[in-house]
Amino acid sequence: MLPTIFLLVAMNVFPLFWSLWLSFNDYKASSKIPPKFIGNANYTEMLSRQESWQSFTTTAAFVVMSVLLQLALGFGLALLLNREFKAKGIVTTLFLLPMMLSSVVVGLFWRFLMDTNFGLINFLLGKMGLMDPLKPIVWTDKQHAMWSVVIADTWQWTPFIMLIALAGLASVPKTLFEAASVDRATEWFKFRFITIPTIAPLLMVALLFRTLDAFKMFDLAWIMTERGSTVETVSVQVFREALRNWNTGKACAFAYIVLLVIIGLTNLYLMMMAKIKGEGPADAVPLFNPESPMIRGIGKFAPPVCGVLLIWGAYSAGGPAFVAVIGVLAAICAAIFFIPSNVRNILAYITMSIALFIYLAPLLWMGITSFKPFADVNVIPPKVVFTPTFENYLKIFADAKFMQQMMNSTIIAVVSTVLAVVMGTLTAYAFSRFKIKAKGDALFFILSTRMLPPMVVLVPVYLMFRSLGLLNTLTGLILLYTTVG
């Protein structure tokens, strides 16, 4: 167990302290000149840059938009799936497919779908009269780039919220609903005072993980918006400084500023979770207690406020027609608690089918496109009837590099996963079974590396691997993925 703990500490805590030291130095990783200590000059310069504050603003907007959308849609899908029906397992798995893809693949998917001239989305918007075909939407410009990245991220990670919410809904004791039914409680009462308080802690955990990941988002912004030119998040800013300008010291300083913000957000979430669970002071009122003034106030004022914001956002996004569509959907959602259960189940199945079709549409379209001849790909209107060909697949499998890449990826995935499970289990057992001094500090430092933008952790690891001769080797990648995972 000790070698396992030592390896985890070496691969996680060492980069943390090394990057912290570099943040106080004038240093370029591409240069052989040793670091020169300059105090807090890097922090002062990064905090005085307008680009740094703009990246924080952009990141905050992205986090709020994407995480709230994922929460609403994921929870809604979980409510739809929280019933017994045939093929429930298959339907749930289909909803999880986007989450199984890498962010790079998702970014390429949506960049192709949102292409200004040949994208399917612009074509459909033009056909529905929501866009002038002569003035197609440029999804990579400053006006629309944020929405394009939010849509792609929401599509990929909504199933994560759905999965956790579904697990929470399955754990709600049925006896509570039966007792409420005996008292002739309405469906809205059951939802508000039984369902929500029971699954709130799990939803907070899901929100914590998604907020941390969204705050570090890099792949989608880089791929979908011309290398982050129109959606420059903090991770894009760190990447430019660390691996484009090779200002390693400045990049590390900015990353630690980001880390402090993330730690603050994490503590805020943990405080809210403690209130939800009623683990605060003895005289504290739990956050989701029905008699709590906060909950009563939210229940009174939240619906009209949310309604006004929803109407304003819908009008800004799509005009009166879009407001009408949103209004109809909101009316259906409100009425669902007051209609007979058999009608509600029928509506749930219809909504689930529509949601599944919309969710799988990007995957289906990309699958269809993969069988098109190259000449039929970038054409308007898109060709639905064509002669399928396996030419694209044959070219890929005929490439020797592809087979080698698949082999390398498989080896790294299998070996690192097995080692991560074994090492993680042994380390967790050691931390829980034995009295280890500074156990909390060690866990904090290990988890802190997961809060930093990946590029900052990779710079010290890159320097360490370069000195050990582990660059461009399977051993180095397996070691990295094992300890980070």
Residue ranges and their predicted role:
Residues 1-285, 312-325, 329, 333, ...:
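A structural signal for multi-pass alpha-helical bundles of membrane permease subunits
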Residues 280-297:
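Membrane-interfacial, low-structure loops and terminal tails that flank and connect transmembrane helices
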Residues 301-312:
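Canonical alpha-helical transmembrane segments of integral membrane proteins
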Residues 338-344:
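Membrane-helix interface "capping/anchor" motifs
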